[in-house]
A protein has these predicted regions:
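Conserved acetyl-CoA pyrophosphate-binding loop and the N-cap/start of the following alpha-helix
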Residues: 92-104
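Conserved beta-strand in the GNAT
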Residues: 53-55, 61-71, 82, 87
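C-terminal "cap" of GNAT-fold acetyltransferases
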Residues: 115, 119-124, 137-155
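Conserved N-terminal entry element of GNAT/NAT acetyltransferase domains
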Residues: 1-17, 155
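Active-site rim helix/loop that mediates acceptor-substrate recognition in acyltransferases
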Residues: 26-57, 63
Length: 155
């Protein structure tokens, strides 16, 4: 099957799908509505590169998404930019799609001269560690233990 990664701002028809995935994985626990989550994925003007969301397509079917944002952790405003909202549709999991999306965002950031990228996770530390990300600190956020990780993109 043919796979490609497209910019969400070029495929506005995918916003409801991407927002639903992100809402189910990350935002519903915080009391945010699906409509509020959709607003997070409303594309920004084309003259800026942050934030950006990309969608992994298999033929014409969206199967995953990932974003790069300026800030993703309110208690660490000094850290930027962030890999965020990496989600693969449940039916497509276990096939390396998260890895594909993470590598794409890393390459995108590298092309923008980003030296270090950040993320936080409560459930995928092992995946990111396998991809070369390092744990920087452990915190509690919204009642969950999270790990803040980073990856140096340039030597």
């Amino acid at each position: 099957m043919h796979e490609e990664i497209v910019a969400l701002r070029d495929r506005m028809d995918l916003v409801p799908t991407v927002a639903k995935w992100a809402h189910e994985e990350f935002w519903s626990y915080a009391g945010r509505t699906l409509e509020q989550t959709e607003v997070l994925f409303t594309p920004v003007p084309r003259d800026t590169w942050l934030p950006r969301t990309f969608v992994l397509m298999q033929s014409e079917t969206p199967i995953g998404t990932a974003s790069i944002v300026e800030h993703d952790l309110d208690i660490r405003p000094e850290l930027a930019p962030w890999l965020a909202s990496v989600v693969v549709d449940r039916a497509a999991r276990g096939r390396g799609h998260s890895r594909t999306l993470v590598k794409f965002i890393e390459d995108f950031a590298r092309d923008k001269s980003v030296e270090k990228l950040w993320l936080f996770t409560w459930s995928a530390e092992g995946l990111y560690a396998k991809l070369g990300w390092r744990a920087a600190e452990r915190l509690e956020r919204n009642g969950r233990e999270i790990v803040v990780m980073n990856k140096k993109l340039v030597d």
